[in-house]
Amino acid sequence: MSDYKDTLNLPETGFPMRGNLAQREPVMLKRWDDEDLYGEIRKAKKGNKSFILHDGPPYANGDIHIGHALNKILKDIIIKSKTLSGFDAPYIPGWDCHGLPIELMVEKKWGKPGRKLTAAEFRQKCREYAAGQVEGQKESFIRLGVLGQWDKPYRTMDFATEANIIRSLGKVAENDHLLKGFKPVHWCTDCGSALAEAEVEYQDKVSPSIDVKFKAVDEAGVVAKFNCAEGHEGQGDVSVVIWTTTPWTMPANRAVAVRDDLEYVLVQVEADAANDKAAYRLIVAAELAKDVMDRAGIEHFHNLGFCKGADLELMRFNHPFYSFDVPIVLGDHVTTESGTGCVHTAPGHGQEDFVVGQKYGLEIANPVGSNGVYLPDTELFAGQHVFKANDVVVETLKEHGALLHHHAYEHSYPHCWRHKTPIIFRATPQWFISMDKAGLRAKALGEIKNVQWLPEWGQSRIEGMVEGRPEWCISRQRTWGVPIALFVHKETQELHPDTRVLIEKVAQLVEQKGIQAWWDLNPAELMGEADAANYEKVLDTLDVWFDSGVTHFSVVDSREEYNGHSADLYLEGSDQHRGWFQSSLVSSVAMKGKAPYNQVLTHGFVVDGQGRKMSKSVGNVVAPKDVTNKLGADILRLWVASTDYTGEVAVSDEILKRSADAYRRIRNTARFFLANLNGFNPETDLVAPEEMVALDRWAVGRAMEAQEEIIKAYDGYNLHGVTQRLMQFCSVEMGSFYLDVIKDRQYTAKQGGHAQRSCQTALFYIVEALVRWMAPIMSFTADEIWNEMPASQGNGEQRDKFVFTGEWFEGLFGLADDEVMNDEFWAEIQQVRGAVNKLLELARKDKVIGGSLQAEITLHANETLAAKLNTLEDELRFVLLTSKAAVAITDSMPEGAQKTDVEGLFVTVNASEAAKCDRCWHHVADVGTIEGHEEVCGRCVTNISGEGEERKFA
């Protein structure tokens, strides 16, 4: 055999079998950076139709986690696929840089502003801290193979961006959507600031559940409303009963709300002589009366009379422990789902309470300070923290005989997303974007219908949120944030009449010096001494959701890279329906009257292999850095693309191992292609399609069909579909059939002969397509493959430096449907081959043959199938990987044959008695008959020193 080894076309390539991605990828990244890959893409696509995926900014604090990796890789895959589809698709990564988490990190080191540092110095420290965090995260994202304008990202703290955020506020005000009000807002006592809806998360909490009695001022007048039978009006005090889980809000109670159309009952609670308890009467919703009595442990009671809630309007009841009385008011928010049907109303501590309070002119009492402590003038509770005061309030109610019942109650309660601590509703002076003042809610709901939501359920989700959302509280009482750069009248608090002009002047200052320019500004510099005497600066800062929400203007509309185009796609986690998607929508409609995006695509959260949330305490956290250091970024990227990311996305060591296995299959397929292109020059060696061996044309046709499906999947953001089709192509169509069949021809045919060159032509065309399909997902590996491919593209042109600057390969072709050996023909041949393989395997197990090339088989088939098999002539044996394959026509199973899965096909398997060729390993009768070449067959002699064998079909 050694004498003939040099006559074989052995595969050879510099593309290694093992990826060693963790070591190789950083080297490739350096090359991408040194040779300005991103800039090369921009040059190549300049002037093409644009596709803009606008990056939702991650927060500049902490290391990136696996959810960040999922998000950034998804974006990168989509952008690279759009680039290959010919779009100019720039990617400008961004960061959210203001806000409390950064303040807290700076406070840990330097203390609160005003102590060791002035406010200005504190802001500078925040800026420096955020910049450092951006750099750390940036390196992590780059390591994932994400291409973008990393040298010039957008940061919400960039002076130009801060200026544009202020301009955005001006536009909102100009369009009459800005509102100043004293309203209850979500308030975190740890932050000392208002929270937006998106900053609130719900967790289970145990609260004191209390039923409280409010005693009627005019008992006879109240009882008269219930139409009791004469002489059966009952006896004892008359009280309306409320239920609440926030006893601390009782000092702010200013009414009891009932529903106008609900039926209410006057209940007589009978005297309990054994416990020295007098009789008394209670008012509750009729539907809930039994529940209330059961809860309070009242066994002896009966109903005295009924009335509608509307009949009780404005009847007055004594506050449980203060010396004033409160009215009964009507509210649509009152239900009979729980409680008593009579709702404790504190307009300073609840949105619905506030609305009812406005309607009835109730006092908006807020006895609680920003730190959650009752103000000094709060009777009975001054100086106590509200949550600690719950027990004190309960005791006070007991002392006043107003507590009907008390027990611990577990329920879902709003918490601060940063501190994970319970929050309160607290009325404070705040700035709002009004949802209804100028029709913003209705316009936003209309615009939602003009957007494509992927998955479709995203539309109903965000519609429900916009329909039900309160006014957007955009003001914060913080130090590190973009200022609400407005001037208000010192007495009336009205906006300055020249607000539009003043906003632009402030924005220009901030553009030069950053947000500190606002705090350093003397109002007289902008408006003159006379106006400055009457107007003052607003010292609140903007909600960071406003910062990121207006990037459709501050970034997309402003960066020259986008050429004035608006965003085609926003892509974030599904939690952003209540976050960035909504803040972007509301601000864009408020500013421009239209949605900021054409499509919104969401992905789910990452969970572990058992579906559990990632948690350090559980020990199931998968860090992107650990994966790239161990397996490489391409494995992580393939994992992302292989998942159905629209739902929860599972990751674990085992799941990543499966991705690594899939990666190896794809890599080995690519390596086979490259290794067998050894010695192939596309400029001189390409075979014309019509002259190619039929099976080679079939293989190129399979690639053409795969490419159509893959591009369609990429266009639909169906990355799971891309990887499935890619795996099917590599493992099934190529690995299990085509590549298996062509090894004999590729290795043993005459070097440079038609049989070999036809095969290499197919391999060349297929790998040209394959490397592009891979590029968006396995970017590093695609780049590696690209650099091992022939320098020429076969059209007189040299290959681009990078696969990412080109477009999908357009040189594929397939078999025509009217050809005898069309796709349907080869599909049937594969079925026959599969059936034969099963029988060969049995023959191997039974030791009839050693390997398939030792087999001589006869295929007994019906006339139709036999005719198809015979079209392959002597080349049928190459398809079946046997040394001999004969076809016989039969309608019944011959003696000694075996039935197969293919209808009408029976097969006889025998061991060949012919000698084995040392070169091709086929068992052929003429081995040993050719002088000078006694060890090989005649076919091999022809391929070594003759014209070379002729192959037409396989």
UniProtKB/Swiss-Prot annotation:
Main enzyme class: ligase
- GO CC terms: cytosol
Question: Where, in this chain's numbering, is Zn(2+) bound?
Answer: C917, C920, C937, C940
The record's principal subcellular location, in a coarse class, is cytoplasm
Which GO MF terms are attached to this record? aminoacyl-tRNA deacylase activity; ATP binding; isoleucine-tRNA ligase activity; tRNA binding; zinc ion binding
SUPFAM superfamilies from the UniProt entry:
Anticodon-binding domain of a subclass of class I aminoacyl-tRNA synthetases, Nucleotidylyl transferase, ValRS/IleRS/LeuRS editing domain
Q: State where L-isoleucyl-5'-AMP binds.
A: E572
**Residues given in the record as ATP binding sites:** K616
Q: Tell me where on the tree of life, at the top rank, the source sits.
A: Bacteria
Family from the record: Belongs to the class-I aminoacyl-tRNA synthetase family. IleS type 1 subfamily.
- What's the domain remark here? IleRS has two distinct active sites: one for aminoacylation and one for editing. The misactivated valine is translocated from the active site to the editing site, which sterically excludes the correctly activated isoleucine. The single editing site contains two valyl binding pockets, one specific for each substrate (Val-AMP or Val-tRNA(Ile)).
Q: Which PANTHER family match?
A: ISOLEUCINE--TRNA LIGASE, MITOCHONDRIAL, SOLEUCYL-TRNA SYNTHETASE
Q: What's the name of the protein?
A: Isoleucine--tRNA ligase
Origin species: Photobacterium profundum (strain SS9)
